[in-house]
Amino acid sequence: MNKKFLASLMALSSISLGVVAVSTQVTGAISSPTILTEETNVGVTFTNNFNPVDSQSVGTQMSLNALSYEPLIQYNAMKPNVWTPWIATNEVFNATGQVVTFTINPKAEWSNGSPVTAAQVANEFNVINTNAGMNVFGVPTLATPATASGNKVTLTFPTPQFANQDALGSVLIFPVAGDNIPGYPAGSPVYITAGTSTLTNNDVLGNGPYLPTGYNTQLISYTASPHWKMTAKPYVTGVHVPYYAANQDATQALVTHQLDWAGNDIPQIKQVFIASNPAQNHFYYPAGSTVTLWFNVSSSAPDGNRDCLADPYFRYAVSMAIDRNQLSQIGETGFEQPATSTSGMTPAQAAYEGPYKNNYNLNGWTYAQVTKYLKDHGFAVDSNSYFAVNTATAAAQTHLSINTECQFSIQDPTGYSDYAEDEQMISATLQGDHINVNTVGVTTGQWNANIFTHNFDAMIHWGAGGTNPYSQFENWLDDPANTGGSTNYGAYQNSAAQADLVALSGLRQGTPAFQAEVNKLSAIMTNDVPVAPLLYGADWDAYTTARFTGWVTPTNQYAYPGPGTNDVALILTKLTKS
């Protein structure tokens, strides 16, 4: 029997301490028919920090930022070229793609009732342009400062940005120094000044439909903003976000309808959630991104003096040895399909796979294949029965001395039951191939901190998704010096990749030139293996219609499902009484 199924049965046989701790606090939400309870992450230590550009804030780690700070445009990642006007009513490119103009929605207001102005939006772009630590959105460097005229914001870039259309429109708008919002003088704590500053719930001046009015270490409470006017008044008047230690705790809460909406893997969801009430309990798991084994090629890796991960040939062998079918069927219980292309493209991007379509052996290489490949590239099995650096060529590639035994660890949160099982299976497979790979389980908070400080050897992590291949490539390949470290967690650097990313960003999607650049980047993914594509990551979206209806479904794809994206406010404003 699957270990995950056993864990889920144990969780259901006795209510865990984590659920007990929050159950009394969510009772109020259950008794109030218009307060929705949701969660999108487990094992996160709640801290009173809602800074939307701080990777360690609870707002970021629990995907709560877009409840209060809205994007300019709501782009639908499920449907190419489909979008909803939001803080901006449109996004227009000039003929060369270097000038982008947003028209600000006259209905957009801060939570004190003052309008969101074009000048404030332009000011934010200028602030993040000069403060890399706040540019978590990957906005390219501006050629000249952003300007405002009337209700229009103009951004000018040195190169075309057609491929960045969705990314630019998805920038969250928040108060920054120099905005001069009425009632909040310079120096007020509502203004966000750095990616590491703390913003308490009482200091959130948002432009979204909900504000964090209650906070403790077990429950975060949001209430409707009285100045939200961009949609009809939402039926959902409040949002509760409880703390759960692990996926199994969230499962128990879903089954008992203490949770209305969950955005993480629910072990054995059909048996333990759907079967308990098929009429009201539902899930929708479309493939939204590519899950990869992300290699840290920087010197800060814990095992950087022996991991051999600086060598692309070693990374290639590791990737090819992995049994992706096993990960799909056991670790992800069939809800995430194995990645079939070394390009990393999702099924929604499959038209761009080019010559890299279906080029994985989904069961992984045999031991004989792994052995031949590694021996051909300068490795040999040592006296401990593990592969080690054996030639000057391999020593030069790995930056390690001859006879160094290759050893690294895969690090993921223990609360992510699927990733924990995936890494165990990868380790077992590679150990069987005489590659010394171990696993490290950490808390979710520690994992997030380690990601941004490059304090890991390898990790299983989701991708950027979207319908445009550029968003995936930029996430994996962009030099972190260009993005303030917000992406490319493995610190992979390749000048050819940078040039190809710049070229791709300036091309219109679907053109022959666009495909040619995609092929170049796919070749880098294939041959250099900065990350190893594993699975087509599901957008975990479990919900109940016991109290609310209007959810995203396979036949009503008006937004990206699940509570973990910028679409969360759009979805909440669509929900009505069941």
Regions found by a protein language model. Give the residues of each.
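Long beta-strand-rich cores associated with HINT superfamily self-processing modules
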Residues: Y543-S578
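Extracytoplasmic/peripheral linker and loop segments enriched in polar/acidic and small residues
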Residues: Y313-Y316, S328, N363, G432-W447, ...
